[in-house]
């Protein structure tokens, strides 16, 4: 009993240490975070209010106690940015989808506003999207409109919490948005992401040709097999026909000839005639 109680005590102590390490100060992050406050001016711009606020890190409302997330403090792109993707300096290409992930336990709201901001002094926003905080990640498609007819744009992926009339903005990773890539770079990235490119036409044509050759060989074999059977049957018919055979002995050939009389039958008799010539020609006339 003492051994069991001791094991239970050690297990509970280990459990408390692990949970305390994860949830205390969001695993190494400061309890207070100073950030700029932004106010919505229009649908396309943000104007800064030169002041700061302190934000206490809290857990998300309504999350189950056994919730599991892939984005944890040990995977943050920076210790002060509770996001795991994308990484700083990643390159995005228009028209493709990319993962954006964050730590839901860091924020104290049910919903977040994701903002794609241009990295310049204009304060122009490329896009905004409302997301559910508890999901922890979304797939974001790089829109060609974000480029504003340029080949490249530097943008940041920011997360915003809304409180009353103000927005608390957490500046996220910086990425390079590209219009397109050269063929060599695009092929290398596609191979790294999707695997080696396969020639679909060759993958279809080569097996088709091989199957066609096999089919022709089978048809030819079947034809030759039937022809050989017919030829052998003809040979057997010829061998079984009457007459001289190539493998019949002389004795067998002689036995197959019609029977010839070697002596006169008992009922045979001669006719007498005074004409000697006639007699000579009719010596053995049978009745």
UniProtKB/Swiss-Prot annotation:
Quote a single Gene Ontology cellular component term: membrane
Q: Which GO terms describe its biological process?
A: endoplasmic reticulum to Golgi vesicle-mediated transport
How does the entry describe its membrane topology? Single-pass membrane protein
Q: Which residues are glycosylated?
A: 120, 154, 166
Note the InterPro entries from the entry: Pma1
The chain's disulfide connectivity reads none
What is this protein identified as? Uncharacterized membrane protein P31B10.04
Ranked from the top, the taxonomy reads: Eukaryota, Fungi, Dikarya, Ascomycota, Taphrinomycotina
């Amino acid at each position: 009993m003492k051994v069991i109680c001791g094991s239970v005590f050690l297990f509970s102590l280990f459990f408390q240490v692990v949970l305390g390490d994860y949830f205390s100060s969001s695993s190494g992050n400061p309890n207070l975070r100073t950030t700029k406050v932004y106010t919505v001016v229009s649908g396309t711009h943000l104007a800064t209010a030169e002041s700061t606020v302190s934000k206490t890190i809290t857990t998300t409302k309504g999350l189950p106690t056994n919730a599991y997330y892939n984005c944890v403090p040990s995977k943050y792109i920076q210790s002060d940015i509770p996001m795991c993707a994308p990484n700083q300096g990643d390159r995005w290409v228009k028209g493709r989808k990319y993962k954006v992930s964050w730590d839901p336990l860091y924020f104290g709201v049910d919903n977040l506003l994701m903002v794609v901001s241009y990295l310049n002094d204009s304060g122009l926003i490329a896009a905004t999207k409302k997301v559910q905080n508890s999901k922890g990640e979304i797939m974001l498609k790089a829109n060609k409109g974000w480029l504003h007819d340029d080949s490249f744009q530097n943008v940041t992926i920011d997360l915003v919490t809304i409180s009353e009339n103000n927005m608390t903005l957490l500046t996220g990773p910086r990425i390079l948005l590209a219009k397109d890539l050269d063929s060599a770079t695009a092929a290398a990235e596609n191979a790294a992401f999707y695997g080696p490119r396969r020639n679909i036409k060759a993958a279809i044509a080569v097996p088709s040709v091989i199957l066609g050759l096999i089919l022709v060989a089978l048809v030819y074999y079947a034809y030759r097999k039937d022809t050989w059977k017919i030829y052998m049957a003809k040979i057997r018919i010829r061998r079984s026909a009457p007459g001289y055979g190539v493998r019949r002995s002389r004795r067998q050939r002689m036995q197959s000839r019609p029977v010839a009389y070697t002596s006169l039958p008992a009922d045979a008799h001669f006719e007498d005639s005074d004409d000697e010539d006639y007699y000579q020609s009719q010596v053995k006339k049978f009745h």
